[in-house]
Structures are given as structure tokens and as C-alpha cells.
């Protein structure tokens, strides 16, 4: 399971001209689900994402996680993160989970975030989405479990 996380001052996702999720300061999480992923991996990744200390403390040091910083989370499914790009000029998506399994794990990940009392917004699984964000820093990390 893969999360590309970006520290943002704001972010939103729109599907068919409808804003489905919008946050102020916090994390934009682009989430990719791979074939071998399960709930245990989703738990570990959620713990890492929410615990990752990439927000500045009073001394300007990256020392706070999203909850400590009072931030929110916007989770957007992105199957392209599971692409194999090592060869050729066209990515292979054979490493991605089947759509039904990927959706179940995506929804599980979102629910785990919400259980941590963090404002968690979402896109719409498998939809064509427009994501807008203001990357703060920029600060972007690739997390994989």
C-alpha cells in the first residue's frame, strides 16, 4: 500500500462539478492499493501517515504530526501509484489490486483515519477527479508498507 502525502495549506477534490472533499491546513493523501495489500497494511500505513511528523513546531522544526498541528486529511484514491514504470514507455498496472478489493481497502483506510478523531475528507473511488492543492513547503513524501 502506497501513500503519497503532501503538506498543504488547502486542498479540494471535485467530481462532476461537485466538491466531494475540502480541507484547510493538513495532508493530501494520494492512496494506491497493491495486489498483496490487506487490512494489516492499511492499519500500518494509516498509523504512519497520521503519525508522520512533517509540521513545524514553535521552533520551526518538523516535529508535529497532522493531529498535533490541528490539521485535516483529504484522502484521494490513485491507482496509478501502483504502476510498474521500470520498462518501456507505457506504465503497467498489473501490480494494482482488483477494483473491488482496492475500494474496500481505500474505505477501510478512510475509516481508520476518522476513528483517530481527525477531520477526514475524501474523493470518490474510481471517479475522474480534479484535485486542487496548495503544497506547503513544498513538503511531499512517499510512504509504502
UniProtKB/Swiss-Prot annotation:
Q: Which gene encodes it?
A: dtd
Keywords in alphabetical order: Cytoplasm, Hydrolase, RNA-binding, tRNA-binding
Q: Where is this motif: Gly-cisPro motif, important for rejection of L-amino acids?
A: 137-138
Which Pfam families does the UniProt record give? Tyr_Deacylase
**Record GO cellular component, one term:** cytoplasm
- Which EC number applies? 3.1.1.96
UniProt family annotation: Belongs to the DTD family.
Organism in which the protein naturally occurs: Salmonella paratyphi B (strain ATCC BAA-1250 / SPB7)
**Protein's name according to its UniProt entry:** D-aminoacyl-tRNA deacylase
Where's it mainly located?
Answer: cytoplasm
Which reaction(s) are listed as its catalytic activity?
glycyl-tRNA(Ala) + H2O = tRNA(Ala) + glycine + H(+); a D-aminoacyl-tRNA + H2O = a tRNA + a D-alpha-amino acid + H(+)
Q: Tell me the function of this protein.
A: An aminoacyl-tRNA editing enzyme that deacylates mischarged D-aminoacyl-tRNAs. Also deacylates mischarged glycyl-tRNA(Ala), protecting cells against glycine mischarging by AlaRS. Acts via tRNA-based rather than protein-based catalysis; rejects L-amino acids rather than detecting D-amino acids in the active site. By recycling D-aminoacyl-tRNA to D-amino acids and free tRNA molecules, this enzyme counteracts the toxicity associated with the formation of D-aminoacyl-tRNA entities in vivo and helps enforce protein L-homochirality.
Amino acid at each position: 500500500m502506497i501513500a503519497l502525502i503532501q503538506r498543504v495549506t488547502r486542498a479540494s477534490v471535485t467530481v462532476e462539478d461537485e466538491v466531494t472533499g475540502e480541507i484547510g491546513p493538513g495532508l493530501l493523501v494520494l492512496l494506491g492499493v497493491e495486489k498483496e495489500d490487506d487490512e494489516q497494511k492499511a492499519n500500518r500505513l494509516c498509523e504512519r501517515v497520521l503519525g508522520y511528523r512533517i509540521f513545524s513546531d514553535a521552533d520551526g522544526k518538523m516535529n508535529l504530526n497532522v493531529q498535533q498541528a490541528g490539521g485535516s486529511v483529504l484522502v484521494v484514491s490513485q491507482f496509478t501509484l501502483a504502476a510498474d514504470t521500470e520498462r518501456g514507455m507505457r506504465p503497467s498496472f498489473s501490480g494494482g489490486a482488483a477494483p473491488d478489493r482496492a475500494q474496500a481497502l481505500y474505505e477501510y483506510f478512510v475509516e481508520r483515519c476518522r476513528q483517530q478523531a481527525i477531520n477526514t475528507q475524501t474523493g470518490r473511488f474510481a471517479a475522474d477527479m480534479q484535485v486542487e492543492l496548495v503544497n506547503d513547503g513544498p513538503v511531499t513524501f512517499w510512504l509504502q508498507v
